[in-house]
Amino acid sequence: MAIFDNYEVWFVIGSQHLYGPETLRQVTQHAEHVVNALNTEAKLPCKLVLKPLGTTPDEITAICRDANYDDRCAGLVVWLHTFSPAKMWINGLTMLNKPLLQFHTQFNAALPWDSIDMDFMNLNQTAHGGREFGFIGARMRQQHAVVTGHWQDKQAHERIGSWMRQAVSKQDTRHLKVCRFGDNMREVAVTDGDKVAAQIKFGFSVNTRAVGDLVQVVNSISDGDVNALVDEYESCYTMTPATQIHGEKRQNVLEAARIELGMKRFLEQGGFHAFTTTFEDLHGLKQLPGLPVQRLMQQGYGFAGEGDWKTAALLRIMKVMSTGLQGGTSFMEDYTYHFEKGNDLVLGSHMLEVCPSIAVEEKPILDVQHLGIGGKDDPARLIFNTQTGPAIVASLIDLGDRYRLLVNCIDTVKTPHSLPKLPVANALWKAQPDLPTASEAWILAGGAHHTVFSHALNLNDMRQFAEMHDIEITVIDNDTRLPAFKDALRWNEVYYGFRR
């Protein structure tokens, strides 16, 4: 995905006319230098665009108003180069509906000990200008991020870049359309929820489309297009004998390709970037979409099974966040456990739909195997193991009065044995701090059995996501202890109860 090319972040300098035109000229000069350097050297995901100085209430209000109405603007980075009285910012910040980051930096890194004078002090006032800006943010109860560090510092670059990913993701989410092919898996609770509340909170819309409408598009795909896509399969994957030309399951592969092309066309025509399916609503489809869903996820689409629109939306959001980063992000499900003293493990998978972006194999296996659930023809699927190393699993749940994001930090490990009779992609991990604590905390907090699994993102990314969307986050990691975790759940209940 080249989604960051569609957005820019505005760089706004706060000052005032008290210091005279020469000081403001130097402020502008410094700002131009910093923005050019950051765009050239900081490896930021999208471009910084310098805006005119904000030196009066009207100028600041105009910048904020323009940011709201510019679809390319993903957010504002504000630098208080000099002191900028914060009452000037009230009207602008009141109307601002884009993410905001305060870059608490200054042009010089070291103090010029021998030459420092009051002119230098008046020009370089971030130390207390930033505090004035911080006060008005706190007074207005306005969520904004703060990054402190010199503008040439790589850690500051990384933090700004991480925030930019969140800002772009938030703007993308406001336009996100989730398509549900069929409804919720019958009688399942956690995959359901309030779609109106979700659209109010996050911006994404969720609507159902009839499977019959999808089938009509699938059936319109030409044999030539199907054969061309299967040629791509053969170059990208290791085909089992049954799936090769003249193999007994070759027709199933052709049908999977037809479904993939039909699904993609349907999603593109409807402007959808996330979708769900359910094995209980497949009328007219010859097989449960496995391979098609896997490949669409790898192309950046959000997905979840059984009508789970919240996880599908979260996957799309996290796909956008992680664009260009190392490691993959996938739909996942905690499936079964391996209990062994000191080596408890979780085997994650799903019936078919795990994204190849997390595969360790360069060429996953493409196979067709029997699947009793759904009552359709044997579906095609990609089979692979997962990369090892630190990862997270995240779940977004609807508690009725609010949304809760659960994040468990995990360590993925190599599968110690082959799985000859398990023809699905899988991931094996150790939950932090340990399986009993992690699973009990997850259950107590109401976490879903569906998650988004990511090697590319980390806990800090998800904390930023929760803060930017003003939702509760519950963390399970090596520092988690159940008594304190239970207390935190109780405190959160009181805190969010007061905010209703």
Curated annotation (Swiss-Prot):
Pathway(s) per entry: Carbohydrate degradation; L-arabinose degradation via L-ribulose; D-xylulose 5-phosphate from L-arabinose (bacterial route): step 1/3
Cofactor(s) the protein requires to work: Mn(2+)
Catalysed reaction, written as an equation: beta-L-arabinopyranose = L-ribulose
Binding site for Mn(2+): 306, 333, 350, 450
One of the record's GO cellular component terms: cytosol
Function: Catalyzes the conversion of L-arabinose to L-ribulose.
Organism: Shigella flexneri serotype 5b (strain 8401)
Keywords from the UniProt entry: Arabinose catabolism, Carbohydrate metabolism, Isomerase, Manganese, Metal-binding
EC number(s) given by UniProt: 5.3.1.4
InterPro entries the UniProt entry points to: Ara_Isoase_C, AraA_central, AraA_N, AraA_N_sf, Fuc/Ara_isomerase_C, Fucose_isomerase_N/cen_sf, Lara_isomerase
Biological process according to GO: L-arabinose catabolic process to xylulose 5-phosphate
Cystine connections: none
CDD domains, alphabetized: L-arabinose_isomerase
Recorded name of the encoding gene: araA
Free-text cofactor note: Binds 1 Mn(2+) ion per subunit.
GO molecular function, one term: L-arabinose isomerase activity
Domain of life from the UniProt record: Bacteria
Signal peptide span: none
SUPFAM superfamilies, sorted: FucI/AraA C-terminal domain-like, FucI/AraA N-terminal and middle domains
Name the record gives this protein: L-arabinose isomerase
Subunit structure and binding partners: Homohexamer.
Gene3D superfamilies hit by this protein: 3.40.50.10940
Sequence similarity: Belongs to the arabinose isomerase family.
